[in-house]
């Protein structure tokens, strides 16, 4: 672009001129000020003929008029071709003389356009001959205030400043506020001159003010509307002008604005998508609302059309925004104007306009929809997103303004807003939420608006209008408060009910609605800036809690979701309670009881209100918080009216806050203006304790705990998760007695998912230490998931605790899992033990102190686990020998690490034993540790790899020769025995001394020590290659024994109880068991040529086992004979031995039978152990599949005694089974233990044993029932068909066993059928089979009852036991129950007829005695009561017994309802019947019973 002076040394722009010269050189000061501030531009004057007629034939192109660059077209217009007269610069001549260069050609350097214009209009005149004509056109985006106004130029001033001060104008003339006001009024009149004071006076030909549309309608131009907008605004800011403005002017303007909007809308609908038309309509809307804001109360100004037209236009524009495809940048001015128009609407509403219900409804409909609209997707354009957020903000403000201004419409507004809740965002994306406060909290617009509305329900305005604090006014205030509270309560209840009802109707689709609402409330509950949250949330929580009341019937899905919501709310409440400062958790009752807490409570309220005031929080929120304070005071006043001291404090507080209102405030300023929100939040938490929400914590907790006992698994799992949320905040919650007891119960729950959730719960913050025993009740659970979880928890507990008792307990449970049906669990358990016992030691080999510490800890744990019980001892041996010391299970490097660490541990172990023995202490713990260490050392010595060295043996030898009488000597003997079996090349002197010591101490040893010492003596003699001394000792023993043998042969009764004889029997048997297995070369007294020692001792023992030998000696002899046979199994082939054993089992000598069983047990165990050692790892469960395949290819090593063990088990099985069912439980355990071993090793056909195992289910001993359950469970996995075929015999045996073990309360043994059902009667496959067998058993018993002669006491007792057990079974199918009930019902009717036939109509005519009738009557009553009991238990009606066969078969797929939990046991009814029988009133009771039924 060219300009005058281009390419010359003259500044072309002001900024360039300022570099060298002051600004005033180019532009006068006053002119510059006007230039900078004036929101106008000067256009070229038009000839008056332009305005003469609107019908001059010109077609106005609105698109051309809307553009800025229209210069060329204006020049070419004929109406503008009249010569333009240009003003000559007034100082041209003088300035020409003062410069060096004066251009001779003024056209030089001008653009072609400028030159063409000047050439057309030639000639210059002096300025005095030129009349100034200018026209002001306001820019649409004017942002500056006009400070200069000249009256002769007709300029308009738009100064916003309303202060009464002088304003400097560009003319240098000062103007007062009154002058400005007058100027504003003149501006309005000037505009009205052209717009017209009525329709006829409008200068529609003025194209600067009027724009003709294609439909021949006229609308005001954007320039005119901008001027008008600024003028109205200036007038609005000057209230003194209100009376000077005539209503007719405003009505005219309103009419024009409405027409502008109408005509623009109609043109847009015709297809003219012109942004200028929308802009005109928006500006008209702004002007219209600004007119409303003038404060004129004339009803004519508030016609429905005036408000509805702009509102409808805005509504249409909103709809078009939803489908807008144009870029935001091209519509920025329109969007800004639209936003400005909307912002005026809430101001208008708050001014108290004359709005009828139709208008209000329209506004509510439009802006509720706009607020909740999510059709417009989130855009990447930040400006557009900001615009849309502002629109929603204003929409919310409009709705809140309507709610606050129109009390009668509040319900409708809330209802309309609730109708849009389905439009809430399905995902909580930040762009779809609104940020509130400075805490980076985002909530939905719905919640924000709803809460902003409800905050307006308070008594602040009422209090503000009170003239004084008189008693009568206080009473009025109380009534007003109750009224407001009631309204708030009802509306909150309605909101929550509506949201929940929508959710209940379609929980899957509308879950996001309730989730969003609750999430918003939880985010705001801790802030004093949102006090109404407490009211909404407490109401919602109560409503959610009521879902679980008996009167509510909802789906399981709804229950689960509601529980999740309750859990989130409860967790937040618990968080608040935990965060509250000490001694500030005071509810109203507590504050009444402790009035000293009141001042601090009121102070907390003051702080929160002052904080809200300081941060400029919403006035409605602060007022609602103040209202809460007022309500609390009124409630306290009601509660404390009888306490003088307290009532004074409360009354003073009430007067104080009311006086503050009269003084124009809500309370004193914040003492510490820099107070942190975290401090204020704690004050607010203290306040919350006085309200309902936090007091709902206890009902919430009780609900959670009660739901843990529900049958619905998902509900229980969710309840546990709720509890977990609390525990994650503070694990102290788990120490709550109520919670603790519930966890204990639920850890025994049958549901795997619930157990898993409980285990997660108790794992929070290592809380499992309080429940470790209950946790490990599930270490052998049916669920793999639960077993793994328990294993992981045990691992953590072992690592985290320093308590040796806990360590031993949990590591023992880990050890038990090296036997499991799941390979992964076996692997886990093995690795845990390997890491803790081996690799952890290996890691610190280069740190002596650490090594000693860790080794000591490992050894202490190992030693205690190894002796914990028989099972742990066996598993420890298995783990040591068949995993750790199994080369096939490890790489060479890993195996070397293991053996190296075990060698080191052995060193420390021997050292520890030596240290403990050297201490002269009698402390119990020290003695126990020493015994445990020796036992562990014995296990190390007995392992497949030798870790003990000669040095170790040498170090332990002094304890061998000591005279100390304790168990230590036994373990030392065991260690030496095992070591000598592996080591060789001992010094002869050491061997000789050791042999001397052993032989000399032999007579003083007890039975256990003899069993260890004899093999050691023989081993030492073998190492010495000299058995002469042993032979001599044996001869000595026999020489003392034979006199007794001779006496027994001659006179059996002459043998009496003799301690010496008993010892000789044990010693001689010991020599025979472990020494001289073959005929000896050394001379042994009394042995014949070729006779072995064990054969000779066998003969001696058979002599001492004769019938007339005293019982004690016979028992010792039989015991030792059986042991001897165990070491030399060929002896069991002796007919003399077998005859003796058979005879003993047929006798009544229980103790001898048990002795034989114990010996057989030792034999079987020893032989199986040998087998395991020979076969190796395949005797344990291996998780290594490659190893399994390898081992399966290896045939099991046969051993000589295999057939003997099986033959013995088979021969004596019946005797063993009989002894299992002894009434004396302690003695029966011996037989049960042997039976378990026989079944485990597979020595006999299990079908013979299964009925007895089933019978043991009826034992009164929980331990025996547990053992029986484990046995049958194992059998069921292997031989399912055998178990089912044995059920009938097993149940019959169980019934007899129940009667046999408890003659008085036999019928209370009511658990064996339910245990059987749990094991083999569940599932689609086994359930029907089990119930079929059960029905057959019942039928067989009932069929045997035909008449009086078939009903003896045994039959009656059997029926009783069967009935009580059936009552505890859990029937699943209706068919199973109904078919059984029909069988029972038919029998009861049949028996009733038999009885009635016998007794006749009167008692005196009895054909038989009542005693003979008692059995059949008891059976009939028990069966009838059982049928009634089962019907009631499952909630069935009597008519199910009338179903025919077809109808009955249809019940197979119908499940029964759950059992009623509050029904007493059936055995109590049988006890009642038996009492009538014992009192001789049975017949009378039967008659009454028959009559009643």
Swiss-Prot record:
GO molecular function: chromatin binding; cohesin loader activity; sequence-specific DNA binding
Modified residues (Phosphoserine): 43, 74, 127, 157, 162-163, 305, 320, 753, 1179, 1182-1183, 1185
Swiss-Prot/TrEMBL GO biological process terms: chromatin looping; double-strand break repair; establishment of mitotic sister chromatid cohesion; establishment of protein localization to chromatin; mitotic chromosome condensation; mitotic sister chromatid cohesion; protein localization to chromatin; rDNA chromatin condensation
Effect of residue 236 to E: In scc2-8E; mimics constitutive phosphorylation, retains normal SCC2-SCC4 interactions and chromatin association, but exhibits decreased viability, sensitivity to genotoxic agents methyl methanesulfonate (MMS) and hydroxyurea (HU), and decreased stability of the MCD1 cohesin subunit in mitotic cells
Keyword list, A-Z: Cell cycle, Centromere, Chromosome, Nucleus, Phosphoprotein, Repeat, Transcription, Transcription regulation
Stretches for region Disordered: 151-170
Record's comment on post-translational modification: Phosphorylated at alternative sites Ser-43, Ser-74, Ser-162, Thr-360, Ser-1179 and Ser-1183 when the principal phosphorylation sites Thr-67, Ser-127, Ser-157, Ser-163, Thr-231, Thr-236, Ser-305 and Ser-320 are mutated to alanines.
GO CC annotations on file: 2-micrometer circle DNA; chromatin; chromosome, centromeric region; cytosol; nucleus; Scc2-Scc4 cohesin loading complex; SMC loading complex
Subcellular location: Nucleus; Chromosome, Centromere
Similarity comment text for this entry: Belongs to the SCC2/Nipped-B family.
PANTHER family hit by this protein: NIPPED-B-LIKE PROTEIN (PTHR21704:SF18), NIPPED-B-LIKE PROTEIN DELANGIN SCC2-RELATED (PTHR21704)
Protein name (Swiss-Prot/TrEMBL): Sister chromatid cohesion protein 2
């Amino acid at each position: 672009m060219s300009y005058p002076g281009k390419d010359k040394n003259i500044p072309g722009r002001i900024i360039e001129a300022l570099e060298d010269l002051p600004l005033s050189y180019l532009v006068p000061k006053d002119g510059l000020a006007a230039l900078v501030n004036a929101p106008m531009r000067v256009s070229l004057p038009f000839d008056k003929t332009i305005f003469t007629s609107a019908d001059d034939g010109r077609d106005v192109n609105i698109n051309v008029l809307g553009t800025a660059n229209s210069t060329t077209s204006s020049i070419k217009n004929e109406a503008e071709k009249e010569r333009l007269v240009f003003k000559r610069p007034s100082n041209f001549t003088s300035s020409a003389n003062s410069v060096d260069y004066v251009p001779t050609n003024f056209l030089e350097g001008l653009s072609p356009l400028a030159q063409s214009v000047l050439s057309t209009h030639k000639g210059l005149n002096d300025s005095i001959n030129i009349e100034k004509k200018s026209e002001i056109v306001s820019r649409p985006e004017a942002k500056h205030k006009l400070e200069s106004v000249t009256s002769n130029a007709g300029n308009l001033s738009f100064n916003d400043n309303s202060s009464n001060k002088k304003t400097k104008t560009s003319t240098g003339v000062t103007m007062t506020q009154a002058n400005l006001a007058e100027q504003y009024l003149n501006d309005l009149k000037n505009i009205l001159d052209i717009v017209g004071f009525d329709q006829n006076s409008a200068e529609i030909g003025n194209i600067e003010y009027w724009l003709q549309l294609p439909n021949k309608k006229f609308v005001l131009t954007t320039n005119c509307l901008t001027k008008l907008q600024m003028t109205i605004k200036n007038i609005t800011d000057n209230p003194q002008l209100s009376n000077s403005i005539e209503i007719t002017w405003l009505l005219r303007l309103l009419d024009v604005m409405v027409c502008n909007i109408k005509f623009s809308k109609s043109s847009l609908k015709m297809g003219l998508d012109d942004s200028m038309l929308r802009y005109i309509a928006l500006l008209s809307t702004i002007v219209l609302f600004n007119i409303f804001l003038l404060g004129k109360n004339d009803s004519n100004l508030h016609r429905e059309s005036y408000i509805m037209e702009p509102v409808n236009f805005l509504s249409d524009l909103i709809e078009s925004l939803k489908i807008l495809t144009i870029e935001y940048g091209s519509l920025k001015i329109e969007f800004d104007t639209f936003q400005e128009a909307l912002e005026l609407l809430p101001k208008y509403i708050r001014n108290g306009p004359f709005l009828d219900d139709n208008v209000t409804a329209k506004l509510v409909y439009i802006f509720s929809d706009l607020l909740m609209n999510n059709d417009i997707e989130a855009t990447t354009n930040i400006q557009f997103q900001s615009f849309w957020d502002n629109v929603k903000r204003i929409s919310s403000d409009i709705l809140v303004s309507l709610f606050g201004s129109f009390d009668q419409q509040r319900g409708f507004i809330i209802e309309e807003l609730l109708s849009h809740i389905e439009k809430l965002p399905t995902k909580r994306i930040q762009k779809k939420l609104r940020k509130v406060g400075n805490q980076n909290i985002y909530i939905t617009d719905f919640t924000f608006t709803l809460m902003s509305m409800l905050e307006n329900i308070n008594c602040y305005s009422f209090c503000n209008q009170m003239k004084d604090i008189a008693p009568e006014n206080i009473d009025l205030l109380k009534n007003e408060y109750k009224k407001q509270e009631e309204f708030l309560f009802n509306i909150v209840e309605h909101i929550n009910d509506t949201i929940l009802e929508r959710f209940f109707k379609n929980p899957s689709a509308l879950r996001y609605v309730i989730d969003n609402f609750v999430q918003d409330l939880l985010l705001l509950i801790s802030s004093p800036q949102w006090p109404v949250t407490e009211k909404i949330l407490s109401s919602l929580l109560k409503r959610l809690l009521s879902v679980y009341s008996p009167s509510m019937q909802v789906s399981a899905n709804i229950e689960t979701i509601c529980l999740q919501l309750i859990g989130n709310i409860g967790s937040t409440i618990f968080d608040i309670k935990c965060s509250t400062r000490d001694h500030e958790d005071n509810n109203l009752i507590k504050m009444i009881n402790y009035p000293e807490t009141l001042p601090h409570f009121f102070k907390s309220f003051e702080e929160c209100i002052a904080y809200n005031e300081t941060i400029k929080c919403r006035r409605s929120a602060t007022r609602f918080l103040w209202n809460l304070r007022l309500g609390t005071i009124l409630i306290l006043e009601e509660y404390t009216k009888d306490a003088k001291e307290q009532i004074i404090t409360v009354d003073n507080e009430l007067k104080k806050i009311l006086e503050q209102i009269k003084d124009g405030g809500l309370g004193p300023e914040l003492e510490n203006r820099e107070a942190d929100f975290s401090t204020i939040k704690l004050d607010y938490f203290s306040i919350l304790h006085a309200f309902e929400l936090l007091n709902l914590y206890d009902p919430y907790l009780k609900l959670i705990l009660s739901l843990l006992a529900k049958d619905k698994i998902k509900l229980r799992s969710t309840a546990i998760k709720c509890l977990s949320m609390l525990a994650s905040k503070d694990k102290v919650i788990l120490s709550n007695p109520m919670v603790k007891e519930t966890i204990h119960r639920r850890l025994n729950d049958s549901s795997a998912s619930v157990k898993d959730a409980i285990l997660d719960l108790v794992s929070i913050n290592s809380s499992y230490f309080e429940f470790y025993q209950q946790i490990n009740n599930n270490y052998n659970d049916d669920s793999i998931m639960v077993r793994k979880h328990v294993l992981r928890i045990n691992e953590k507990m072992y690592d985290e605790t320093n308590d040796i008792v806990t360590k031993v307990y949990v590591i023992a449970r880990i050890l038990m899992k090296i036997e499991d049906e799941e390979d992964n669990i076996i692997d886990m358990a093995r690795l845990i033990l390997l890491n803790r016992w081996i690799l952890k030691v290996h890691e610190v080999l280069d740190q002596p102190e650490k090594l000693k510490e860790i080794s000591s800890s490992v050894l202490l744990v190992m030693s205690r686990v190894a002796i914990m019980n028989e099972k742990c001892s066996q598993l420890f041996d298995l783990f040591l020998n068949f995993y750790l010391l199994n080369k096939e299970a490890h790489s060479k490097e890993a195996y070397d690490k293991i053996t190296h660490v075990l060698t080191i541990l052995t060193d420390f172990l021997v050292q520890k034993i030596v240290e403990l023995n050297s201490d002269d202490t009698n402390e119990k713990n020290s003695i126990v540790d020493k015994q445990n260490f020796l036992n562990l050392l014995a296990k190390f010595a007995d392992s497949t790899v030798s870790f003990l060295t000669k040095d170790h043996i040498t170090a332990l030898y002094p304890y061998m020769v000591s005279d100390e009488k304790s168990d230590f000597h036994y373990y030392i003997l065991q260690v030496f025995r095992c070591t000598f079996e592996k080591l060789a090349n001992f010094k002869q002197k050491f061997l000789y001394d050791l042999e001397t010591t052993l032989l000399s101490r032999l007579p003083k040893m007890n039975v256990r020590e003899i069993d260890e010492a004899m093999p050691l003596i023989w081993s030492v003699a073998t190492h010495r290659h000299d058995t002469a001394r042993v032979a001599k000792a044996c001869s000595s023993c026999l020489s003392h024994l034979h006199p007794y043998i001779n006496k027994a042969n001659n006179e059996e009764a002459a043998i009496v109880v003799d301690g010496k004889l008993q010892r000789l029997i044990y010693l001689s048997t010991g020599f025979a068991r472990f020494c001289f297995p073959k005929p000896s070369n050394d001379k042994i007294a009394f042995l014949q040529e070729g006779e072995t020692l064990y054969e000779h001792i066998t003969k001696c023992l058979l002599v001492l086992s004769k019938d007339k030998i005293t019982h004690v000696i016979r028992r010792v002899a039989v015991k030792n004979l059986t042991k001897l046979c165990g070491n030399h199994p060929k002896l069991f082939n002796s007919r003399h031995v077998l005859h003796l054993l058979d005879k003993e089992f047929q006798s009544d000598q229980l103790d001898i039978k048990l002795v034989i069983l114990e010996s057989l047990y030792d034999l079987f165990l020893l032989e199986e152990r040998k087998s395991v050692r020979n076969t190796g790892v395949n005797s344990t469960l291996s998780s290594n599949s490659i190893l399994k395949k390898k081992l399966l290819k290896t045939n099991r090593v046969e051993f000589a005694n295999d057939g003997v063990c099986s033959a013995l088990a088979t021969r004596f099985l019946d005797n063993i089974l009989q002894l299992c069912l002894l009434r004396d439980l302690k003695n029966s355990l011996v037989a049960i233990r042997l039976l378990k071993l026989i079944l485990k090793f597979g020595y006999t056909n299990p079908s013979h044993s299964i009925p007895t195992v089933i019978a043991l289910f009826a034992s009164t001993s929980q331990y025996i029932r547990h053992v029986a359950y484990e046995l049958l469970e194992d059998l069921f996995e292997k031989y399912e068909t055998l178990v089912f075929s044995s059920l009938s015999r097993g149940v019959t045996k169980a019934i007899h066993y129940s009667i046999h073990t408890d003659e008085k309360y036999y019928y209370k043994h009511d658990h064996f059928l339910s245990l059987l059902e749990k094991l083999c009667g569940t599932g689609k496959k086994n359930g029907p089979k089990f119930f079929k067998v059960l029905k057959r058993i019942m039928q067989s018993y009932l069929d045997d009852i035909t008449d009086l002669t078939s009903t003896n006491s045994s039959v009656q007792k059997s029926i009783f036991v069967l009935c009580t057990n059936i009552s505890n079974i859990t029937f699943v199918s209706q068919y199973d129950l109904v078919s059984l009930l029909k069988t029972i019902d038919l029998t009861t009717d049949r028996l009733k007829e038999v009885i009635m036939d016998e007794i006749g109509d009167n008692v005196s005519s009895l054909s038989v005695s009542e005693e003979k009738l008692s059995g059949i009557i008891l059976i009939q009553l028990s069966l009838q009561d059982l049928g009634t009991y089962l019907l009631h238990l499952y909630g069935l009606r009597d008519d199910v017994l009338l179903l025919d066969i077809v109808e009955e078969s249809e019940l197979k797929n119908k499940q029964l309802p759950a059992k009623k939990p509050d029904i007493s046991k059936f055995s109590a009814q049988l006890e009642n019947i038996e009492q009538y029988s014992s009192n001789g009133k049975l017949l009378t009771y039967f008659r009454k019973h028959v009559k009643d039924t």
